[in-house]
Amino acid sequence: MKALKIALTKGRLEKDAVALLEKAGIDCSSMTDKKRKLIFHSSTQPISFILVKAVDVMTYVKHGVADIGIVGKDVLMEASKSHYEMLDLEIGKCQFCLASTPDFDPSSYRRKIIATKYPTVASKFFREKGEDVEIIKIEGSVEIAPVLGLADAIIDIVETGSTLKENGLLIYEKMYPISARLIVNKASLKQNKTQIFQLIDQLEQAIKEERIE
């Protein structure tokens, strides 16, 4: 049986994803002592794991290097769709928010400048509101953009809001809820349908148990 390759997002989401996979009966013991390794093979199941950055999960899945990926909905919303989104894993929950300094007026008709790591999401949000805005893409700490006068406001993902608060920003609008999703390569789903749907069934059961707990 061909081993399923699962691409996991490195960092905070990785820990939650591994915990959920283990709850679903997936052997993740090879990842216990990671050191600098990025590829891991289960010794008991036909499954291997790849640890990559969030945006690269989609690339590995798109090109079939990984059969399955676990990645935040924020990344999926920003990129073009080249995969099947199969399951909301209900982990890594946060929210897209519009935030700025206390003197920001969201109802102003003046053309606003919005800083964000997510220009596609920001464009969609303001297009739906019928507002014409200028969007500046920021790769680093977007929170300082309105403080330093680069932008009128920001759009970013917010979990607790503590980073915004520490930088003197307020949330003006909560936009789209975000959580981690299971994505599958289109060709892999055809070739490994039984294996993949068995994994999905196991994860769905684990998610149900998490809700009860």
From Swiss-Prot:
E.C. code: 2.4.2.17
Subcellular location as annotated: Cytoplasm
Pfam families: HisG
UniProt pathway: Amino-acid biosynthesis; L-histidine biosynthesis; L-histidine from 5-phospho-alpha-D-ribose 1-diphosphate: step 1/9
Enzyme's top EC category: transferase
One term under GO cellular component: cytoplasm
Keywords noted in UniProt: Amino-acid biosynthesis, ATP-binding, Cytoplasm, Glycosyltransferase, Histidine biosynthesis, Nucleotide-binding, Transferase
Molecular function GO terms recorded: ATP binding; ATP phosphoribosyltransferase activity
Catalysed reaction, written as an equation: 1-(5-phospho-beta-D-ribosyl)-ATP + diphosphate = 5-phospho-alpha-D-ribose 1-diphosphate + ATP
InterPro entries in UniProt: ATP_PRibTrfase_cat, ATP_PRibTrfase_CS, ATP_PRibTrfase_HisG, ATP_PRibTrfase_HisG_short
GO biological process: L-histidine biosynthetic process
KW ATP-binding (keyword) present: yes
Quaternary organization: Heteromultimer composed of HisG and HisZ subunits.
Protein role: Catalyzes the condensation of ATP and 5-phosphoribose 1-diphosphate to form N'-(5'-phosphoribosyl)-ATP (PR-ATP). Has a crucial role in the pathway because the rate of histidine biosynthesis seems to be controlled primarily by regulation of HisG enzymatic activity.
Family statement: Belongs to the ATP phosphoribosyltransferase family. Short subfamily.
Domain remarks: Lacks the C-terminal regulatory region which is replaced by HisZ.
PANTHER family: ATP PHOSPHORIBOSYLTRANSFERASE (PTHR21403:SF8), ATP PHOSPHORIBOSYLTRANSFERASE ATP-PRTASE (PTHR21403)
NCBIfam families: hisG
Full protein name: ATP phosphoribosyltransferase
Protein source organism: Listeria monocytogenes serotype 4a (strain HCC23)
Gene: hisG
